[in-house]
């Protein structure tokens, strides 16, 4: 190493090459010693000697203090999201105002039941409600942007699902490990990573080693909630371009559903338009041509606070359902297309569960069932959960109790839904809010 010039050497004055330099002790005895505070540099203050008019060879020099430079705090007020997403979203939007989704005017003028002034007033009254939804939607966009750019063949489904869920927890600021924290905000339901003929409700349980392959078609369905306001949105990933038309058919069918939705829109008619759009597409896979079929026993749905399925269903095929959408309602418009039968059934190991909102109060003979129900009530309420979430909370040996809760009708199980083996399915989904003056596609992004 090269020798460094110290401050003590810099301040040393040599009057004469032959002169003897005073020692520290001699300087002190002669009254020439500098105060210790001035003899040392400070991190905050730098001093510069300034020659005064009367300063001679042995005279004292005046000193000027530099202004303190404000120290920058590491990570203070970040302006952009990290990679992977870990910056709390509220730090990126300190005003508490979050990006507005896509605002779409209603097509039917008869849907305007109030004046423009009244509608604007109602929108202002709903501001807290809308900001919670918009916050959740922006988190969904940022998390999926990273996920879509980084999901690659060779990753396990567990890595993919947990990566998404960890990002959601970080951006909402709710890790979900403390009692009740997940009910305030965070992951709204288990992340679905559904391959090929599996259309929905597949999330890996502990020990699952399934690996994503280049030839797979994977539906990624995840949710974010703030104070129970659930943003439910899904997309499909395929690496092989031969599946492009399948994905495009379903994406456009979902956009058709959004276009037809609105105050007083009849659910059965929306399904008819969705079906027409999807069936207008064909896809050639491995030399065989398929018409893209809507999966007729899967539907969109309304969303209530802390309840992913509110009671209304939005069909994706023509039906006689005359039920109308109403002002203020929130809907998940989702469509599923298939190269198979266009019909799904329960199959494979179950991972998804949810407590029934109006569950019966029945005596539980299995002690572990009562203990588990207490954990579910305090950590999930009526939000869906999966076995991995129970594992994460430190629960073990709970399967007997969980099955007992299911058999008593207290908890509903949601097994994976599959079309025929060898077929391929795709899904796209958005959450919309029927505001008084327009419908807002809350989860809309640049990607879909």
Swiss-Prot record:
GO cellular component, one term: cytoplasm
CDD domains, alphabetized: MetAP2 (cd01088)
Compartments in which it is found: Cytoplasm
Keyword Protease: yes
Acidic residues bias (residue ranges): 37-50
List of residues binding a divalent metal cation 2: 232, 301, 334, 429
GO molecular function: initiator methionyl aminopeptidase activity; metal ion binding; metalloaminopeptidase activity
One Pfam family, short name: Peptidase_M24
Catalytic activity: Release of N-terminal amino acids, preferentially methionine, from peptides and arylamides
Cofactor: Co(2+); Zn(2+); Mn(2+); Fe(2+)
Biased composition (Basic residues): 61-74
Keywords, sorted A to Z: Aminopeptidase, Cytoplasm, Hydrolase, Metal-binding, Protease
InterPro entries in UniProt: Creatinase/aminopeptidase-like (IPR036005), Met_Aminopeptidase_Type2 (IPR050247), Pept_M24 (IPR000994), Pept_M24_MAP (IPR001714), Pept_M24A_MAP2 (IPR002468), WH-like_DNA-bd_sf (IPR036388), WH_DNA-bd_sf (IPR036390)
Residues reported to bind substrate: 201, 309
Region feature (Disordered): 1-94
UniProt keyword 4Fe-4S, yes or no: no
Principal subcellular localization: cytoplasm
Binding site for a divalent metal cation 1: 221, 232, 429
The record's free-text note on cofactor binding: Binds 2 divalent metal cations per subunit. Has a high-affinity and a low affinity metal-binding site. The true nature of the physiological cofactor is under debate. The enzyme is active with cobalt, zinc, manganese or divalent iron ions. Most likely, methionine aminopeptidases function as mononuclear Fe(2+)-metalloproteases under physiological conditions, and the catalytically relevant metal-binding site has been assigned to the histidine-containing high-affinity site.
A GO biological process held by the record: proteolysis
Similarity comment: Belongs to the peptidase M24A family. Methionine aminopeptidase eukaryotic type 2 subfamily.
UniProt cross-references to NCBIfam families, sorted A to Z: met_pdase_II
Listed HAMAP family: MetAP_2_euk
Record's protein name: Methionine aminopeptidase 2
């Amino acid at each position: 190493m090269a020798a460094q010039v110290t401050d003590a050497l810099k301040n040393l004055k040599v009057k004469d090459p032959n002169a003897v330099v005073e020692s520290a002790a001699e300087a002190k005895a002669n009254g020439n010693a500098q105060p210790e505070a001035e003899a040392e540099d400070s991190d905050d203050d730098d001093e510069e000697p300034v020659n005064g008019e009367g300063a001679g060879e042995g005279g004292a020099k005046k000193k000027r203090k530099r202004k303190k430079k404000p120290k920058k705090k590491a990570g203070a007020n970040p302006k952009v999201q990290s990679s992977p997403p870990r910056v709390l979203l509220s730090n990126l939007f300190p005003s508490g105002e979050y990006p507005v989704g896509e605002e779409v005017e209603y097509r039917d003028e008869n849907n305007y039941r109030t004046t423009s002034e009244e509608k604007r007033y109602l929108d202002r009254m709903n501001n807290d409600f809308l900001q919670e939804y918009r916050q959740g939607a922006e988190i969904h966009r940022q998390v999926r942007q990273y996920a879509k750019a980084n999901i690659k063949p060779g990753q396990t489904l567990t890595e993919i699902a947990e990566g998404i869920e960890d990002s959601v927890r970080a951006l909402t600021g709710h890790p979900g490990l403390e009692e009740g924290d997940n009910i305030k905000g965070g992951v709204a339901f288990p992340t679905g990573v559904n391959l090929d003929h599996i259309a929905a409700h597949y999330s890996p349980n502990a020990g699952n080693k399934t690996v994503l392959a280049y030839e797979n078609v994977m539906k990624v369905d995840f949710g974010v909630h703030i104070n129970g306001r659930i943003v439910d949105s899904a997309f499909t990933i395929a690496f092989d371009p031969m599946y492009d038309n399948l994905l495009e058919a379903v994406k456009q069918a979902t956009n058709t559903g959004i276009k037809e939705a609105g105050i007083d829109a009849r659910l059965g008619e929306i399904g008819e338009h969705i079906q027409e759009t999807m069936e207008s597409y064909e896809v050639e896979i491995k030399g065989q041509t398929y018409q893209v079929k809507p999966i007729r026993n899967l539907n969109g749905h309304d969303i209530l606070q802390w309840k992913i399925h509110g009671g209304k269903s939005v069909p994706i095929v023509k039906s006689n359902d005359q039920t109308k959408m109403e002002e203020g309602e929130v809907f998940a418009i989702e469509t599923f297309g298939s190269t198979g039968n266009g019909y799904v059934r329960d199959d494979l190991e179950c991972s998804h569960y949810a407590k029934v909102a109006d569950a019966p109060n029945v005596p539980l003979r299995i002690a572990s069932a009562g203990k588990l129900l207490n954990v579910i009530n305090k950590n999930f309420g009526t939000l869906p959960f999966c076995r991995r979430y129970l594992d994460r909370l430190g629960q073990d040996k709970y399967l007997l109790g969980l099955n007992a809760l299911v058999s008593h009708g207290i908890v509903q199980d949601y097994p994976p839904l599959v079309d025929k083996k060898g077929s391929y399915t795709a899904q796209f989904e958005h959450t919309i809010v029927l505001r008084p003056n327009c419908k807002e596609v809350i989860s809309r992004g640049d990607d879909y």
